[in-house]
């Protein structure tokens, strides 16, 4: 079976991309264990707890990221440069445990996957 990477690169609640990506990730995990999640660019904001989506009349799907462990999704990476560029600390308690990688290492890791789905 092909290795599948899910890349979150957009802010949460601005569009439906993050929620749809999470739904696709959870559905795909029922079919394969060979997948990983990457948070890059504005996608790092998907990891922040305490968001208030009701202020923009959006559904709070961020808490659903906490279910990744129950779905045996353990390969989670976050771009360290993206965190720095947005003033976020890698030590922040994110909703999901994601390993920070510098951009070059993240690209090398992402190259190990056959299919890359970006949300």
UniProtKB/Swiss-Prot annotation:
GO terms for biological process: tRNA processing. InterPro entries: DsrEFH-like (IPR027396), Sulphur_relay_DsrE/F-like (IPR003787), Sulphur_relay_TusC (IPR037450), Sulphur_relay_TusC/DsrF (IPR017462). One of its GO terms (cellular component) is cytoplasm. Keywords: Cytoplasm, tRNA processing. It is found in: Cytoplasm. Part of a sulfur-relay system required for 2-thiolation of 5-methylaminomethyl-2-thiouridine (mnm(5)s(2)U) at tRNA wobble positions. Heterohexamer, formed by a dimer of trimers. The hexameric TusBCD complex contains 2 copies each of TusB, TusC and TusD. The TusBCD complex interacts with TusE. Belongs to the DsrF/TusC family. PANTHER family: PROTEIN TUSC. This is Protein TusC. It comes from Escherichia coli O1:K1 / APEC. The lineage of its organism: Bacteria, Pseudomonadati, Pseudomonadota, Gammaproteobacteria, Enterobacterales. The gene is tusC.
């Amino acid at each position: 079976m092909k290795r599948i990477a899910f890349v979150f690169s957009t802010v949460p609640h601005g569009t439906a991309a993050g929620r749809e990506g999470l739904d696709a990730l959870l559905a795909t995990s029922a079919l394969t264990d060979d997948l990983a999640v990457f948070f890059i660019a504005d996608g790092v904001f998907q990891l922040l707890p305490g968001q208030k989506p009701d202020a923009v009349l959006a559904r709070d799907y961020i808490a659903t990221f906490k279910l990744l462990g129950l779905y045996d999704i353990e390969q989670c990476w976050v771009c360290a440069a993206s965190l720095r560029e947005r003033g976020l600390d890698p030590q922040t308690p994110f909703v999901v445990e994601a390993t920070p990688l510098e951009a070059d290492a993240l690209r090398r890791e992402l190259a190990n996957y056959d299919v890359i789905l970006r949300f």
